[in-house]
Structures are given as structure tokens and as C-alpha cells.
């Protein structure tokens, strides 16, 4: 994913279908490990397509999810509160909130309890090293945890980065609040009606329409059914590689 070359913040119109916000979920048992090094440089990029997690605003509070949690990429952007439990030797007090930004692939050559941590049906979080060390000691390697879905709290609006080329508009959707995980997206040009976009990979959404020279609006729906419309966030002079900021969920 190319780095964002331009950031234009313009929230010209917004509408949400619900007003109560995302409620989250109950606590579930899982395990957690870490990857990416002490500076989390190895966590950049990833299967969600977010690229540089620092410039996208996610920082080091990130996790790669096992197959059981990743949901073929639909969980990208979801937020989880995690706490270490049942291990007095290695656990530290408190909890962390992380965003799903990557996939932890299975290793079927290893048993689930001896290296195949992300094998189905394991519920497992491979955390960035800095955030892992906030709930457990480095030497632990792997710890039992409890997790729950929580609302994502974001600064600013949802970001739409338009990549690709004519007739292949690939829109990366980031910085989504509320449930955080986009399950459907639509685009509307100033000379078109609303058109459904298909998920290409991660949180990259694709439209094969010719949208050049039109102002663009986006409609985003998250896993809890909340829908938000960002009207005319990209003006008619937009170009590929630019990022535009719209409305926000809570």
C-alpha cells in the first residue's frame, strides 16, 4: 500500500442510522503472544492493508488475529480490550485496547498448544511487543488472556484513501470508530447514484466505475449495522493517492 500523499479534511455532510453507538461484548478466554520487535516495526503493513500504522493513527496498540477471530478480513479495524489472567508469575495488572490490523496465520505443522497458537479453532492475539509488555512480562512468551469487543474511539473522521486507476478505484477505509470493522461500503459520484463496492482485501474496497472528475460520497456500514454517510468528502478535482476525511461513528 502506497503511503498517503495528501490529507484533505472536509466533512461536508454526515448521517448515522443509529444514535446509541456500539455496545461491545462480554469477556471471552483466549491466549496472546507478541511479534514485530521492541519498536513494533515488524507489525507495519499487514493483511488489513493499513500500511504504516503510525501514520494511520493506530500506533503500537495493534494485534494480528487468529483465523477464528480474523473472519477473512472482516474483523480488520475492530477493537478489543485484553487483560492477562490466571498467571501470577507473568501477568501484569490492567488492560489494553488494541485494533485488529493483521492476520496471524495457522501453522498446521505444530500442535495448537506448542507453537500452533493461531491454528483453528484457537482464539489468539499476536500483539505488538510494546503493547504485550503492558499486560505481561516479556519472558512469558505466551499468556492466557480474557478479551472483549469494545467501541473504537478515534480522533477525527473516517479516512478514505483513493488508490488504483480509472475504472479500478481501490479505497482504503481507515480510522473507523464505533464497531470499527467495515462490513459494507458504497460510493456515489456527483453524476451517479449509490453503488455497492466489493471488498478486495483487508479494508480495501473496490469500485470499477469511472468516477474521475466527480465529487465523491461514501456510505459505510460496520458489523453492528450502524451506517454513516460522508457526503462530498472528495471534491471533483481529487486524484489517486489522496486521502479524504469524512464523518465518524461512535
From Swiss-Prot:
Bridged cysteine pairs (disulfide): 48-76, 79-152, 84-91
SUPFAM superfamilies cross-referenced by the UniProt entry: Barwin-like endoglucanases, PHL pollen allergen
Signal peptide: 1-17
Gene Ontology CC: extracellular region; membrane
Domain (Expansin-like EG45): residue spans on this chain: 45-157
Main location as per UniProt: secreted
Domain of life: Eukaryota
GO biological process, one term: anatomical structure morphogenesis
Family (UniProt): Belongs to the expansin family. Expansin A subfamily.
Function, as annotated: Causes loosening and extension of plant cell walls by disrupting non-covalent bonding between cellulose microfibrils and matrix glucans. No enzymatic activity has been found.
Protein name, as recorded: Expansin-A1
